[in-house]
């Protein structure tokens, strides 16, 4: 079986030169996938200044380098209210398909233009759902923030804010076209299946879990600390919920009078949220740790009271799954696909988005009741070990591919 992936990252291409957490879960999948007999894998991704094709350790890589768009073209994209012309990109994708001649094509994510190639090839195309831009855009701003407020932070950045918003809107329109064009989907949650069927009611949907980063599979022991420690891994977009962390931490400190440490990993720009909440992260025992390697995050999770996930929207965040497989109790907002990962009060806790009061109560409860904490964490680990079993995931993926290929042949 010849398989072509279009991905948002280079996966293991030049893996030794990467500095930022490797290639993530797709690189983990690649390592397992290429060990299967009778599988030939090619991976294509955007990366300028590279050859058209590179073969390395049994994988064929196709870095894509687009010709630079003229300024007038960029201006048209910025001002346009319709899906832009992606003929140049589609032509590049078709060259790769023609060169590799795959039996099946998997597009990882609907965030970029890869999926637009589906109507132009007879090869079956399946979309691996990651996030879905349209509902993400709907939840982009916390309830106390407007686009006007966001633009007024720095008048000098007004044009940049407009461009960012316009890019999101255009990407959502492009995604809508992709979801209409692709017939086959692989997802993991009730949420991503429901949303996909809104855009494409007749699509064929297959379940497929994701492989986590390697350090989280290694045998590890969770040790509850005597002091209260909370860990979170998020990124900078406002919908990731840093405001909920600030508000929850304030209740823990000023109302419940608890001593604690809250370590937040990832690229965080706190100034805007601090200004709008009136809470500075230093004043409520929060430590911004920046980007860290998987092993460091793993050790922090193994030695914390709980893992807190504050997003206003998410599908199946790997940060939550990584905490679960380590046996850590997760408190998360009840949004998007997260209820497919966590059963409330069984293998974790779910709270409404923007509810710092329940969040603070549950953190306090887990700190005081170590038996409850350990039981919930153990339940989470049992579920996550099954969900993220490497062999099962790869076997399921190949089975999905074969079903899609067979279905495609029947429909010709």
Task: Kindly label every feature range from the protein language model.
Residues 329-332:
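Short hydrophobic beta-strand element within catalytic cores of glycosyltransferases
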Residues 28-29, 133, 149-185, 198:
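Membrane-proximal helix-turn-helix segments that form the acceptor-binding/catalytic region
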Residues 4, 221-240, 246-249:
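Conserved donor-binding/catalytic core segment of Leloir-type glycosyltransferases
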Residues 273-295:
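Nucleotide-activated donor-binding/catalytic signature segment of Leloir-type glycosyltransferases, i.e.
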Residues 358, 365, 372-387, 393-399, ...:
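A short, well-ordered alpha-helix in the C-terminal region of glycosyltransferases
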Residues 1-55, 59, 250:
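N-terminal subdomain of nucleotide-sugar transferases
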Residues 344-345, 349-356, 365-370:
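Conserved acidic donor-binding segment of nucleotide-sugar-dependent glycosyltransferases
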Residues 312:
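Aromatic "clamp/platform" in nucleotide-sugar-dependent glycosyltransferases that forms part
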